[in-house]
Amino acid sequence: MTQYASPILTSLLDTDAYKLHMQQAVFHRYPAISVAAEFRCRGDELLGEYADEIGAQIALMSQLALTDAEFDYLSGLPFFREDYLNWLRDFRYDPQQVQIENHAGKLHIRIAGPWREVIMWEVPLLAVISEVVHRHRSPDVTPEMAVAHLRNKLAQFKAMSSDVDISRFKLMDFGTRRRFSQAVQQAIVGTLKNEFPYLVGTSNYDLAHQLDLAPVGTQAHEWFQAHQQISPVLANSQRAALQAWLDEYPDQLGIALTDCITMDAFLRDFGPQFAQRYQGLRHDSGDPFEWGEKAIAHFQKLGIDPMSKTLVFSDNLDLDKALALYRHFYQRVNLVFGIGTRLTCDIPGVKPLNIVIKLVECKGKPVAKLSDSPGKTICQDQAFVKALRKAFDLPLVKKAS
């Protein structure tokens, strides 16, 4: 099987933009902090048989390095400082940080080391796992098949949206981590760029570079999770994370993720200063209509015009769900829809993987994601979940996975 000895990943930038945006903030603020992250398959699929092949790809990742052209590209963007880019130029993946094993048929992966390095593994490694599994399960699928299905969906979208002013609809590709393959993502995003006028960007830095699209993404759950152990007082940790992000990016990348604890706990922390300075909020779990109404009501309560803010929806979206949300909200707030798996792994006969890699420890102590969807809660330490719920004044119920 020599075809599988070649690397799936060929660019250090083949990852989500928010990884570099967060990595720079960690590089500047928390260079000495260590973390651990673990792989979770949210379904009951047994992926352990692919461990050796995934391990071989992990070893190949150590060869990835920023090219001169990529360095110049990042230097031309408004987000990055010179000290970070010079460090990133020397960055190499260290496969020693990754433990991978086939545990009775289940795929076990744990990544540990300095946060500023570990932060880079999640997205490309998930993309590798997804591509390895799909090329075994669906060896005959081609990018052309994915594009044909996309064109059907775009035609359907056009028909379904004909009775509404769609001019303010904005789509972002968020599909790197669970894509069928790199070739499929490239074909899908390239097709959207040429055929769908509402595409405003991609989360993938390599594709943004190649296709001349806006790179999009701010921070992930891990930013808030790590602050649970960085902040001296647990109850202040979310505010500390929000403030540290503003300190790094005072007037850009200002979309805040709301569901690390829960939306209600987030809004209690998201007072007038934060609400004015952040450009908007991102939804990633729970009922999106209810969430959007809460966000709009919160801005109004603070005397802020919701039309000056943006809501980003990114939880398990497809074009139909995005259109329903657009119809509901577009006259009251700015909207962006981040669609991932339903763009880059939406091919008839192919079952996408429901896989994640999440932070589980910071400074050797537990961190948790509670979220607005019980099935998305992640933490191994029940005592810590209890402490977190108490600190954020939440009922002590939902069990962690």
UniProtKB/Swiss-Prot annotation:
Keywords: Ligase, Phosphoprotein, Pyridine nucleotide biosynthesis. One of its GO terms (molecular function) is nicotinate phosphoribosyltransferase activity. It is an enzyme of class 6 (ligase). Pathway: Cofactor biosynthesis; NAD(+) biosynthesis; nicotinate D-ribonucleotide from nicotinate: step 1/1. InterPro entries: N/Namide_PRibTrfase (IPR041525), NAPRTase_N (IPR040727), Nic_PRibTrfase (IPR006406), Nic_PRibTrfase-Fam (IPR007229), Nicotinate_pribotase-like_C (IPR036068). One of its GO terms (cellular component) is cytosol. Transiently phosphorylated on a His residue during the reaction cycle. Phosphorylation strongly increases the affinity for substrates and increases the rate of nicotinate D-ribonucleotide production. Dephosphorylation regenerates the low-affinity form of the enzyme, leading to product release. Its EC number is 6.3.4.21. Signal peptide: none annotated. It catalyses: nicotinate + 5-phospho-alpha-D-ribose 1-diphosphate + ATP + H2O = nicotinate beta-D-ribonucleotide + ADP + phosphate + diphosphate. The modification Phosphohistidine is found at H221. One of its GO terms (biological process) is NAD biosynthetic process via the salvage pathway. The keyword Phosphoprotein applies. Belongs to the NAPRTase family. Catalyzes the synthesis of beta-nicotinate D-ribonucleotide from nicotinate and 5-phospho-D-ribose 1-phosphate at the expense of ATP. This is Nicotinate phosphoribosyltransferase. It comes from Serratia proteamaculans (strain 568).
